[in-house]
């Protein structure tokens, strides 16, 4: 199966199963998006045949950290990963993983990664806000602008509907990064021993 026709998943993960997670299954130029909640729903939606999954959630801890607990001796270690610092150098805004709500998201992301990898799926972290910045299209704060920007990829399917959510648009962004990853046209930032983040190659701006 060629990378062009391979099936990939994009997951805009929420920190809690009570909140909406955006999900996208992308095969070739057809995308199916939905809003899910539980890990079980996500695993069921991934189904079979997915080669790669890109998740919008931290999937590694800063060097020297064994956990994100405040009462652990490791709390005095690093608060930023190398990939986080590289985002900062690129001028891309992000939330540090030691920030309150991000801790829960990180732990959920790590659990989901393990479950997906047990199925033989290649799983990696991405950041749709960074991808959108690199492509030169609006972030989800401007959903109509983001929708117009993503339409430049000429992807059909269920996602262009009028009531598509911000989470689903970010999930589609993640899936597009996963597809580009299989095509060998992405870059990885960070420290391989600590954890990498996969993003579009810089200079790939779109005309919006």
Where would I find each of the regions flagged by the language model?
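Phosphate- and other anionic-substrate recognition elements at nucleic-acid/protein interfaces
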Residues: 1-208
């Amino acid at each position: 199966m060629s990378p062009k026709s391979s099936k990939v998943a994009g997951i805009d993960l929420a920190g809690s199963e009570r909140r909406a997670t955006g999900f996208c299954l992308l095969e070739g130029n057809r995308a199916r998006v939905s809003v899910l909640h539980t890990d079980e729903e996500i695993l069921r939606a991934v189904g079979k045949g997915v080669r790669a999954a890109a998740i919008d959630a931290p999937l590694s801890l800063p060097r020297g950290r064994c956990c994100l607990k405040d009462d652990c001796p490791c709390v005095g270690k690093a608060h930023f990963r190398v990939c986080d610092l590289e985002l900062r150098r690129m001028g891309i805004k992000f939330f540090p993983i030691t920030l309150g709500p991000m801790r829960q998201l990180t732990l959920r992301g790590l659990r989901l990664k393990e479950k997906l990898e047990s199925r033989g799926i290649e799983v990696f972290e991405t950041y749709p806000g960074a991808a959108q910045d690199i492509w030169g299209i609006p972030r989800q704060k401007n959903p109509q602008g983001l929708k117009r920007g993503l339409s430049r990829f000429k992807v059909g399917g269920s996602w262009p509907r009028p009531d598509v959510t911000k989470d689903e648009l970010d999930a589609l962004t993640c899936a597009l990064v996963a597809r580009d990853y299989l095509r060998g046209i992405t870059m990885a930032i960070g420290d391989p021993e600590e954890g990498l983040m996969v993003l579009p190659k810089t200079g790939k701006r779109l005309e919006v």
